[in-house]
From Swiss-Prot:
The lineage of its organism: Bacteria, Pseudomonadati, Pseudomonadota, Gammaproteobacteria, Vibrionales. Signal peptide: none annotated. GO terms for cellular component: cytosol. Belongs to the methyltransferase superfamily. PrmA family. Keywords: Cytoplasm, Methyltransferase, S-adenosyl-L-methionine, Transferase. This is Ribosomal protein L11 methyltransferase. GO terms for biological process: methylation. The keyword S-adenosyl-L-methionine applies. It comes from the Bacteria. Gene3D superfamilies: Vaccinia Virus protein VP39.
Amino acid sequence: MPWIQIKLNATNENAELIGDMLMEETGALSVTFLDAHDTPVFEPLPGETRLWGDTDVLALYDAEADTQLIMSQIKASNMLAEGFAYKIEQLEDKDWEREWMDNFHPMKFGQRLWICPSWRDIPDPTAVNVMLDPGLAFGTGTHPTTALCLEWLEGLDLSGKTVIDFGCGSGILAIAAIKLGAEKVIGIDIDPQALLASKDNAQRNGVADQLDVYLPQDQPEGLLADVVVANILAAPLRELSSIIKGLVKPNGQLAMSGVLDTQAEDVANYYRDELHIDPIVEQSEWCRISGRKQG
């Protein structure tokens, strides 16, 4: 059945209150917050709000909803300034699962690595192919930080090497490393669900025997790897720099992402005491910091 969507422009100070009012007083089936200027917020600074300064509040109603009554209730709430901007539109009914699936295509990284959803044909059967379906929480290659790490791994000779995926999420980097020739890969994550996702995805790719996963407190003592990749965020890369450096063998290599261009130099400085840092690589305001540990 079709749906009715009402979009209101709000500020970050009242967006959540407006959302609550729409759910409780006007019968909205769902409420979504979007940045009115398409500006993503991935890692707020301490004390910053997670909403944007100019926020669109989207409320969804069934097709029989009385929009005049809803608008009168919104105006009566006095939560929005007089003459506030809004938009009412009817959304056609669709096969939303099919629409969602159609948005995902095989993606190529470097010269020979492909990440492919399971419902798509493999573009090049002779290439290195990782089969991975998009999920709700973990990486699938679409974000620049994941892409930067995949391209870096694809450019290495991983034959016979041990790799640590620090903050493994879906296991995409760990699985790619195995498919690219790594002998053994260890995934570490603070989220037990990430460890389950990594093992499940490794099983689907036929490489589960080469992947061990651990919560940080459970990882083996003295764990070392030839290659370490950490696609997390700037704050934990700074806070955990001693731990991450300690996972890299002498002459081993490290790559980190989840870092904005404005944060890259500061994060890199936490690693310069033990690593020779490569030129920082940027993609869509995100950066990859890589280097080799001194022997």
